[in-house]
């Protein structure tokens, strides 16, 4: 997987995008929603924030559409006003200064899957060492290879 990861990283140099402040772990689990307005009132968990590529940050955020068991089938969440992935991506591109081709999108999504696989592998190491904090941390071992495989499928599209 290391060689595949290196290939994905080299492909991400497709465009020289401007650097922006990126969250690093933006997801629905890291926001507080105002129950009266249904709008995000706070964004939490900024310890991974840095200056970086906003498209990479957005694509990592979009992994929720593929791997978030809490939300179930997020593409079926119209009643919650959650758009499907294609609509969400289009809205982001329309409201940002960035454009991304389908090929670039797949490369960025593959990179995001590899990133999450690396995080899962790190958690697996903490389970092995007895330093894992989460009660379900031992389940990450099973997901590491699957995430890397899914990342590679994206890159090959």
What feature does the model see in each segment?
Residues 74-75, 102-104, 130-136:
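Short, surface-exposed loop/turn segments at secondary-structure junctions
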Residues 11-56, 60-62:
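Active-site acidic catalytic loop and adjacent metal/ATP-binding pocket
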Residues 32-41, 71, 97-100, 137, ...:
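Conserved NTP-binding catalytic cores of kinases and kinase-like/nucleotidyltransferase enzymes
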């Amino acid at each position: 997987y290391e060689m595949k990861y290196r290939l994905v990283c080299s492909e991400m140099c497709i465009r020289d995008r401007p650097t922006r402040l990126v969250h690093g772990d933006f997801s629905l689990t890291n926001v507080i929603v105002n129950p009266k307005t249904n709008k995000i009132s706070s964004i939490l968990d900024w310890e991974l924030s840095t200056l970086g590529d906003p498209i990479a940050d957005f694509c990592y955020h979009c992994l929720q559409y593929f791997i978030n068991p809490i939300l179930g089938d997020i593409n079926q969440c119209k009643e919650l006003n959650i758009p499907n992935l294609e609509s969400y991506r289009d809205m982001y591109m329309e409201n940002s200064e960035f454009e991304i081709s389908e090929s670039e999108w797949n490369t960025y999504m593959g990179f995001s899957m590899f990133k999450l696989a690396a995080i899962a592998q790190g958690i697996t190491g903490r389970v092995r060492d007895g330093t894992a904090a989460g009660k379900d941390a031992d389940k990450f071992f099973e997901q590491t290879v699957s995430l890397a495989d899914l990342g590679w499928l994206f890159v090959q599209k």
